[in-house]
Each structure stands twice: as C-alpha cells, then as structure tokens.
UniProtKB/Swiss-Prot annotation:
Belongs to the cytochrome P450 family. The lineage of its organism: Eukaryota, Viridiplantae, Streptophyta, Embryophyta, Tracheophyta. Pfam families: p450. The keyword Phosphoprotein does not apply. It comes from Arabidopsis thaliana (Mouse-ear cress). This is Cytochrome P450 734A1. The gene is CYP734A1.
Length: 520
C-alpha cells in the first residue's frame, strides 16, 4: 500500500515541479529578461531612459517626483510642466525628449517630436488607443473613449449628429438657461459692496453637469440628471482609489470606498436601463419632446433609434459622455477664468468685444458666438497653457518604423501634450506667457508647426465633443463678462494638478464684482 501511494506521489511532485519551473521561467522572462532586451533594442538606436528595476520599473521614482511636485502650491506662473508632468520634465533633461520609461514591466516611449506625433495620429492602421486602466474605464465607461475598430466607427457615426454645428446652435438656449441660472445665484449672494467670492471650479462642475444632462438625455433630462449625480459620487470614489493604483489588486479589495463604488455602479446601470426603456416606450407611443420641431438631437434618442446598438452600449456611452463632457468643459472654464483674473488687460479686451457684439443687456445668441473672436483667442491660449488632458498614449499594433526608429509590437507611446504646448521651439520665447494674440490669425498660424496645438487630440480620434465644449465656454464667459469684473480671491493657491485631467488642487476661489452702469 505504501509503495502504491509513493508511486503516485512522485509523479505529482514532478508535475508540480515542472509547473513551478515554467511559472518561474515565465516570470523571469516577463520581469527581467524581456525588459533587458527592450532596453538593449532601444539603446542601439540612441534611446535611453532611467534603468529598469525588477518588477516595479521606475514607478518608485516616478510617484516620488509627482508627489513632491504636488506637495505645495507654485508661484503665479504658467510654466506648469515641471509640476504636472514632473517625471517627464526631470528625465527629459537627462535623456532628451525621446526616452524609455517603465511602469512596472510595461515600457513606454515618450514622443514629443511633432513630426513623429503627426505620424502616430495619422496612421491608425499601425497605432491604436491604449487600453485604459480598469479604474479609468469604470469612470469613463466602455464607450467611444475606449472602443476600437468597427464598433468605435459605428458608435461615432451614430453619435456625431449630436455635435454637428447646426444641432449645437439649437442647444444655445439650453446652455444660456443653465448659465443665467448660475450667475443669477451669484448675484443673489452679492454683499453690500457688490462683491461675492465663488469657487468657480465647483460651480462650473454643476453647470456643465446640467448642460451635459440636457444634451445627453433631452426630454428625459430630469431622470438623466439623477443618474449623473450617482456618477458624480462614483467619480469621487474612483479618484480616491486611483491614488492607490500602484497597489496590485487594490480595486478588488472590499474597502469601504470600493464597496460603495460597486453599489453605485449597480444603481447607475439599473437607473439607466429604466430610463432607456421608458424613452423607448415614449417613442413607440409617439410622446415626448422628440416629436416637436425643431428640437436638438440628443445622445440617448440617437442611440435608441440606431441599429446594432445594445442597451449595454447605451449605458456605457452615457457614462463616457458624462465623464468627458463634464470634466473637459468645466476645467476649460475654470482655467480660463483664472487666466482672465490674472490678466485683467485681456479680461477688459474680452469685455469690450462682448459689449460691442452682444450689448450690455442682451443675452448672447447663436449669431453672436461666431463674432466673439477675442474670446476664441483667449480660449485657445487657455487650452495651450492648461490642456485638460496633459498626455495621451498610443500602442503599436505591430512592429513598425516611426521616423527612423524601429518600434516593437506592443510598445506604448506616451505623447506629452503639455510638453508640446510648452515647447519654446514651437511657440517662441514667450511660450510660458499668456498671450492670446498669438492666435489672432487662427490656430494654423499660431505655432511654428501644425501639430504644435493638440488639446483635443489629432486624426480620426479627435475629440467628438470639442465644438460643444467651446460653445458652452464662449456663452458662459460672455454672460459672466457682461455682468461682472473678477479677480483672484486672496485665498487662491496656484496648484495645477493631474488626476486623469488637469485641475486646480485647492479649488479656484474668484472674487466677482457687479459691473456698474458707469463701467458699462
């Protein structure tokens, strides 16, 4: 009996030993030998970078630099690259603009040369959008922001009519209602001396949430807004979890925050499913605003009417629309208001234009928007200095040649948008100064290279909602400038910080003063 059991035991041990050996070999290949081969491959082409460390890559140094840079506010300067992308700023000085950096065993090649960037964005057959981290995907949804291939093209074709200029013009009254409601509330808070301090970062979040809700859900606005409130709560929890993204498996831990986030995710999906079913039923019954003309096309209505779109697809697109639409526009408005507070001479120029085009009492119209050239210049300069997305990533789908470099399949290409926007060779000696006049002859002539300005990306995947963001920003600023003068509050601390998007770490308190008849 003992001989029989031992005869079974020995093969089991051998099998386990073989499996363990294979796991060790595979692990060593992934965590040590492969990184060494990659470093050697790029070194032969003159590309270096901080040395790879077993398992963690350069994460320890990278996180340390980012935490140190954001640990205290910075002076009132627009040279924010050393703060918001500190690892890139530091290693660029050592290794040049194109270098290798390791996020664990995953390698990324930084690419800041505008010619190479144009090549990456224009050749979608060779380069694809990188797979988002699961926490990011939980926030932005598995919609247009993360889809690839035919499904991405199908969804973009369905959603595009929402963002056509003719449709956006129909949204002007919608945006203006939200904006005037906001500034009316500010007016109600004015003190006896005609001033009020407002954290515009918080207020613009509420404003853009309101506009995005109306744009996404149309006649189902109130139900949609309730869903977006749940998503706003989930966004805060995911942002907290994202700060611990380098702890392996943290998103699976049953922490209080994760448990609450999972619960919210179920509530969001359940609420959206109910909303979609109700909207579908209304369409069948011939009820709702969608039957009236003219009416703006909303995202939900277009997706419900489309073929080959599942309910789950609609849920994911609603999440994507909320995340991208709300954050991008609110951040653009926040930084532009901060810039106009720092530079009163440009605030005065913008006011002169708004009062000349719109008058001091009339609400701006769709016809006024195209005439606000100074505001366009100001918004472009704001997007240059403080782009909502400071970097983006593409992935090589196969072995490919980029410029003169041989790029292996799977290479992640990190494009530091903010470094391109702050490149002296592209923008001149005043690169870190707020100078909207550089855009006086339009975007194409503002920089020394056509790819010098890419706040909304480039190529086929350029941001689909950029026209809505600019329209909303123009209308909001026009109404604000008509009614108030404004400057930085004494409590304002200049601390641009990145948590997926560029935002003011300590908020944006601004003091608004009612514009008197004399100033009109």
């Amino acid at each position: 009996m003992e001989e029989e059991s031992s005869s079974w035991f020995i093969p089991k041990v051998l099998v386990l030993s073989v499996i363990l050996s294979l796991v060790i070999v595979k692990g060593m290949s992934l965590l040590w030998w492969r990184p060494r081969k990659i470093e050697e491959h790029f070194s032969k082409q003159g590309i270096r970078g901080p040395p790879y460390h077993f398992f963690i890559g350069n994460v320890k140094e990278l996180v340390g630099m980012m935490l140190k840079a954001s640990s205290h506010p910075m002076p009132f300067s627009h040279n924010i690259l050393p703060r918001v992308l500190s690892f890139y700023h530091h290693w660029r000085k050592i290794y040049g603009a194109t270098f290798l950096v390791w996020f664990g065993p995953t390698f990324r090649l930084t690419v800041a040369d505008p010619d190479l960037i144009r090549e990456i964005f224009s050749k979608s057959e060779f380069y694809e959008k990188n797979e988002a981290h699961p926490l990011v995907k939980q926030l932005e949804g598995d919609g247009l922001l993360s889809l690839k291939g035919e499904k991405w093209a199908h969804h973009r074709k369905i959603i595009s009519p929402t963002f056509h200029m003719e449709n956006l013009k129909l949204l002007v009254p919608v945006v203006l209602k939200s904006v005037t409601d906001m500034v009316d509330k500010w007016s109600d808070k004015l003190s006896e001396n005609g001033e009020v301090e407002v954290d515009v970062y918080e207020w613009f979040q509420i404003l853009t949430e309101d506009v995005i809700s109306r744009t996404a859900f149309g006649s189902s606005y109130e139900d949609g807004r309730a869903v977006f409130r749940l998503q706003a709560q989930q966004m805060l929890l995911c942002a907290e979890a994202f700060q611990k993204v380098f702890i392996p498996g943290y998103r699976f831990f049953p922490t209080r925050g994760n448990l609450k986030s999972w619960k919210l995710d179920k509530e969001i999906r359940k609420s959206l499913l109910k909303l979609i079913e109700r909207r579908r039923q209304n369409a069948i019954d011939g009820e709702g605003e969608e039957c009236k003309e003219p009416a703006a096309k909303d995202l939900l209505g277009l997706m419900i009417q489309a073929k080959n779109v599942t309910v789950q697809d609609i849920v994911e697109e609603c999440k994507s629309f909320f995340f991208a639409g709300k954050q991008t526009t609110s951040n653009l408005l926040t930084w532009t208001t901060i810039l106009l507070s720092m530079h009163p001479e440009w605030q005065a120029k913008a006011r002169d234009e708004v009062l000349r085009v719109c008058g001091s009492r009339d609400v701006p119209t769709k016809d006024h928007v195209v005439k606000l050239k100074t505001l366009s210049m100001i918004l472009n300069e704001s997007l240059r200095l403080y782009p909502p997305i400071v970097a983006t990533i593409r992935r090589a789908k196969s072995d490919v040649k980029l410029g003169g470099y041989k790029i292996p399949c799977g290479t992640e290409l990190l494009i530091p948008i903010i470094a391109v926007h702050h490149d002296q060779a592209i923008w001149g000696n005043d690169v870190n100064e707020f100078n909207p006049a550089r855009f006086a002859d339009g975007v194409p002539r503002a920089a020394k290279h056509p790819v010098g300005f890419i706040p909304f990306g480039l190529g086929v995947r350029t941001c689909i909602g950029q026209n809505l963001a600019i329209l909303q920003a123009k209308l909001t600023l026009a109404v604000m400038i008509q009614r108030f003068t404004f400057h930085l509050a004494p409590t304002y601390q200049h601390a641009p910080t990145v948590l997926m998007l560029l935002y003011p770490q300590h908020g944006a308190p601004i003091t608004f003063r009612r514009l008197t008849n004399h100033e009109d």
